[in-house]
C-alpha cells in the first residue's frame, strides 16, 4: 500500500529492490571515525581542491566543492545535475583528489558508448558495468548460466567506484553492482535525474534521490561555455516548463518548419547526406535521427526504410539479405535491441589477429554491418571499440536498422548532430524528459497541423 494506492510488483523486481535497499543501508556509512569533518580536515581538503583547480585549469563553484567534500565524508554520494552544470568537471576533481591520496579508482558506465565518453572526458579508463563485473558467458552443456564473476564472494578491489549515466541503470544491474561492492568502498553515482528512466525495470537514480537517505549534490549553475549553447539553454527551459528560444541566429539549435511528410523526408536526406557533413564535419553515421514513436509516417520503422534507401542504397558487390520484415545490407547502421549475455565478440588487429575477446552485447549497442555471408548464413556486425560479432540469421531478430531510433533508445548517448522530425500527432509524447543532451547540433523538423501553435513545442 502507498497511501490509498495499491502497488503491484513482479516478485523478481520486488526482491531485487529490497535486496538493493538492504545492501545500500549496509554500505551507507560515514568514512570518518569522528562522523564529521573537523574544521582542520575540511580546510586541508579544500586546499587540495584549490591545488587541483590550479593544476588542471578548473574553476569550481560552491556546489562542486561541496560534492568533493561529500565524496570524502561519505561512502555513498549521488551527484546529479542537468546538461552544462559541470558534472564532468566535478568527477575529474574527485578523481584527481583520490588519486592524490593513493586510492584505487574504478570508473564505469552502463553502455560502451557512455564508458568511452567517460574515458575521453576524464583521461581515466572507464569500462561498462558488465565488463567491470566480469560477465562470463553461459555454458549450456553444463547448465551454467551467464553470470558476473565479481559478487559478494569476489568483490571489486577498488577504494572508489564512480558510475556515470546512472539514469540508465535498471534495478537488476544495480543489484549486481552492489553485490560486488564491499563495505568501506566509496560509491559515487552520477547522472541527470531529469533524463528518461532506464529501459529495464526500475528508476534507480530517481528513487535513490527521492528516498532522502543518501547525500545528494544537485549542480545547478550553467557554466559560461554551456550558456553559449542554445541546446543546453533550451534543455533547462523545458525542464522548467518554459517556452524554448527559437532564433535563426543560433549556432546549434534550429527549427525547420515543413508542410508535408514527403517534404520532411526529402529535407532530412539532404541534411544527412549533403549539408550537415559539410557544416559540422560529421559523416552520415555520426548524425542520428530520433523520433518519439515506432509507428506512423515519421516513426522508426518507416524512417529506417526511407533513410536506408537513400544513405545506403543497393549497389553491385554489396550483399543484402531479407530477414523477416527487415532488409539488411552491408554498410547498414544497426542496433542490438535486447541484452544477450551469450554472444561472443572479438577485436582483431589490422592483420586479422584476435587481440581481445569477451561475451555480451547489450540493448542499445550500435554498430555497422561489415559482411553478410550468404553461404554460412551469418552477418558480421562491428560495434564500438571495434568489437566484432558474428550473428546467425536467426539471431538477427535481436538486431534492427538504426538510421532512426526512438528517443528512449538514445538514452545516455551523445551525437554530433541530431534530427528530430515531429508531427503534432506526437503531442502527447512531447514531455520534458524527451529532450536529450546532444554534443553539437540539434535540428527539429515539424509538420504543423491546422490550428496548432508553436507554443506546443513546450
Label each residue range with its predicted role.
Residues 79, 107:
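Hydrophobic anchor at the beta1->P-loop junction of P-loop NTPases
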Residues 57-73:
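N-terminal pre-P-loop "Q-motif" helix
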Amino acid at each position: 500500500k502507498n497511501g490509498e494506492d495499491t502497488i503491484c510488483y513482479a516478485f523478481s523486481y520486488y526482491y531485487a529492490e529490497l535486496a538493493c535497499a538492504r545492501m545500500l543501508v549496509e554500505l551507507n556509512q560515514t568514512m570518518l571515525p569522528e562522523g564529521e569533518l573537523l574544521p582542520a580536515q575540511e580546510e586541508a581538503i579544500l586546499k587540495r581542491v584549490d591545488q587541483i583547480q590550479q593544476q588542471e585549469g578548473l574553476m569550481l563553484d560552491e556546489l562542486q566543492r561541496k560534492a568533493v567534500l561529500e565524496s570524502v565524508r561519505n561512502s555513498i554520494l549521488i551527484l546529479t545535475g542537468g546538461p552544462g552544470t559541470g558534472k564532468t568537471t566535478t568527477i575529474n576533481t574527485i578523481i584527481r583528489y583520490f588519486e592524490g591520496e593513493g586510492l584505487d579508482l574504478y570508473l564505469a558506465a552502463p553502455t560502451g558508448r557512455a564508458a568511452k565518453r567517460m574515458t575521453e572526458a576524464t583521461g581515466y579508463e572507464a569500462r561498462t558495468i558488465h565488463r567491470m563485473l566480469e560477465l562470463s558467458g553461459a555454458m549450456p552443456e553444463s547448465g551454467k548460466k551467464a553470470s558476473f564473476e565479481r559478487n559478494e564472494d569476489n568483490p571489486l578491489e577498488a577504494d572508489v567506484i564512480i558510475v556515470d549515466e546512472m539514469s540508465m541503470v535498471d534495478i537488476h544491474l544495480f543489484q549486481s553492482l552492489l553485490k560486488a561492492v564491499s563495505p568501506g568502498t566509496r560509491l559515487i553515482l552520477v547522472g541527470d535525474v531529469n533524463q528518461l528512466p532506464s529501459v529495464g525495470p526500475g528508476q534507480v537514480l530517481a528513487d535513490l534521490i527521492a528516498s532522502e537517505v543518501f547525500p545528494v549534490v544537485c549542480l545547478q549553475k550553467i557554466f559560461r561555455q554551456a550558456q553559449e549553447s542554445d541546446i543546453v539553454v533550451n534543455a533547462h527551459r523545458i525542464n522548467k516548463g518554459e517556452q524554448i528560444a527559437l532564433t535563426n541566429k543560433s549556432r546549434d539549435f534550429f527549427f525547420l518548419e515543413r508542410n508535408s511528410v514527403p517534404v520532411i523526408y526529402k529535407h532530412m536526406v539532404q541534411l544527412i547526406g549533403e549539408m550537415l557533413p559539410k557544416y559540422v564535419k560529421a559523416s552520415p553515421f555520426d548524425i542520428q535521427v530520433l523520433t518519439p514513436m515506432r509507428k506512423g509516417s515519421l516513426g522508426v520503422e518507416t524512417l529506417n526504410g526511407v533513410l536506408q534507401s537513400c544513405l545506403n542504397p543497393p549497389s553491385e558487390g554489396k550483399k543484402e539479405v531479407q530477414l523477416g520484415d527487415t532488409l539488411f545490407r552491408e554498410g547498414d547502421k544497426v542496433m542490438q535491441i535486447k541484452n544477450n549475455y551469450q554472444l561472443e565478440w572479438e577485436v582483431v588487429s589490422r592483420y586479422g589477429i584476435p587481440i581481445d575477446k569477451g561475451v555480451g552485447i547489450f540493448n542499445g549497442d550500435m554498430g555497422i554491418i561489415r559482411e553478410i555471408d550468404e553461404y554460412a548464413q551469418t552477418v558480421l556486425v562491428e560495434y564500438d571499440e571495434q568489437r566484432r560479432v558474428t550473428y546467425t540469421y536467426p539471431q538477427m531478430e535481436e538486431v534492427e536498422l538504426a538510421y532512426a531510433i526512438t528517443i528512449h533508445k538514445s538514452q545516455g548517448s551523445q551525437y554530433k548532430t541530431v534530427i528530430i522530425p515531429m508531427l503534432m500527432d506526437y503531442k502527447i509524447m512531447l514531455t520534458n524528459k524527451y529532450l536529450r543532451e546532444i554534443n553539437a547540433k540539434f535540428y527539429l523538423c515539424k509538420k504543423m497541423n491546422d490550428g496548432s501553435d508553436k507554443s506546443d513545442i513546450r
